[in-house]
C-alpha cells in the first residue's frame, strides 16, 4: 500500500503550504517506505509515499502525462492495466511500467468518465494543470482508505489516513467508496452502482457452484500481479484457505506473461498467527500441508497483544471493538511478514459479507432479508474489515489484496439467488463456496464452522480484553461517558477503553465521526437485530454470542 496526501484549491502557493503537505505525508510514510515524491504547481500540491509492488524501478509517483500537464497520485493496484495499455498502444506514450499510469491515459481519452473501465483497488487524486481542475476517486467497496477535508479559506485536503489530516485542516470526513469528486461539479458523486443491490433483481436468478469457482479463481489470478515477493494470510478458516489454495495453483508461473515464464518466487509462503493452541493455528497447519505452502506460524501472548493496543489503535484509526480485537494479531503478524521480505499478501476478507457467513445469518427469516443484509454489510465494509486489513498491514509497509471483493467477482457472487446462500437452523454457512472448493481443501477445513478471526486466534484473547478493560474503566466513568464522549457514546467498558486511547491520538470531532457505532451481534448491522429476540439485549461482536449455533457459545 502507498500513501497519498495533499492540498487542492490553493489560491497562492507558498513554502508554508508545501511544508505542510510534506508533514502530512510524513505522517503516513509507514504506508510507503520505499520512496517519497511531491508535486507543487497551479492550485495543487500532491504528495506520495510509495510501496513499490509493480515496476519498482520506474514507477515512482506522482505520475505525469507525456506533456506533464496532468499529474496523478495513486494508492492502489489496477489489475487490468495490461489490457488498458494494449488498447492505448500507439495512442498514448506511457512513461513508466506502473499499473496506475493507465488512469492518465483513460483521462486523456474520456475525461472523468472512465472509472468503470478500471478493475482494481484504488484511491487517487488527478490534477489537470492545463484546466486547473482535479478529480478524486475511490474504489467500489473502499478497500483503499481515503479521507477529504477543508479549511476556512476553502482549500481542500486529502489523505490516506486520519493522521494525515488531523490538526492540518479544520474538518474532514470519509471519502465514500464508489464515489468521485470533480472540482468542476463541486461535490461528491456516486460512480459505482449495481442492480444486484435490489432483491427484485436477483430473486429468480440461478446459483451455480461452477460460476463461483471460475469467478473466484479468475479474481485471485488477476490479483497475483507483482514484481516483488508475495504470500497469503492463512488463518485456517474457509475463506483464507480457499484463497491460499487458488494462489498456490497459480504461484509457479508468472501471470504477467500469461504463464509463459516461471514465477520469480515460485514457492508460496503462508502466514498464521494465534495464541498457543488456538483453533486457527491447528487448521492452518492442515491446510498448508495439504496445498504445499511454506508455512510460518507465529505465536503471540495475550500480554504482547495488550502491549500493542495503543499502537494498534493509532495505526488502524478506530475504536470499534471487533476491529480493535481482530487488528491486534494482524498488526503483530504484519511485522513478521515484512521482516521476511514479503511486501504483498492475499487475504480472505469479504466472503462473510458476500455469502452471509457470519453466524447470525442463520437467523435470517427470508431470502430477501438475507440478501438485503449482505448488501448493507458490503456498503459498510470500508469502516470494518477493509479498514482492518489495510491499515493493520500497511502499518508495517505490507499491501493486502482481497479477491472476494474483486469487482468482477462481486458481479457474479451478488447476483446469485439468495436462497442458495441461506443457512437456516444448523445448516452450514457458505455452502456454495464449500462445494465449489471442497476438492482443494482438507475436509476438516472445507466444512469447518465459521470462526471470526478475533475468536480463532484464541478464545482467551477476547476474554482477557473484556476482563482488562472492565477493570480499567470505573463505573463512575461509564456513568459520565456521555459527557466525555457525546459523539458515539461508549455502551460498555471495552468500548470506553478503546475510545479513550483513540481520543489521545485523534481528539477532533471529525475523527470521532469517522468511526461507526451501532448495536451489533457477531458483526451484524443494527437492522438484523430484529431477526431474533435473543439479539435485542446483546451488544457483542464475537461469534460466540450466537447461542444455539456457535459450538463454543457464551452461556
Task: Label the predicted regions.
Residues 104-105, 241-245, 331-335, 356, ...:
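Short, hydrophobic alpha-helix immediately C-terminal to the catalytic nucleophile
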Residues 1, 339-346, 365, 370-555:
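Adenosyl-5′-phosphate
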Residues 125, 321-331, 375-378, 474-479:
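Short, basic, helix/turn surface patches
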Residues 342-352, 358:
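Short acidic/histidine-rich active-site segments
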Residues 17, 96-99, 118, 205-212, ...:
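Hydrophobic (often cysteine-bearing) scaffold residues that line and stabilize catalytic clefts
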Residues 1-319:
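Cysteine-centered catalytic environments shared across enzyme families
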Residues 273-334, 360-369, 391-392, 415-423, ...:
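ATP-dependent adenylate-handling ligase core
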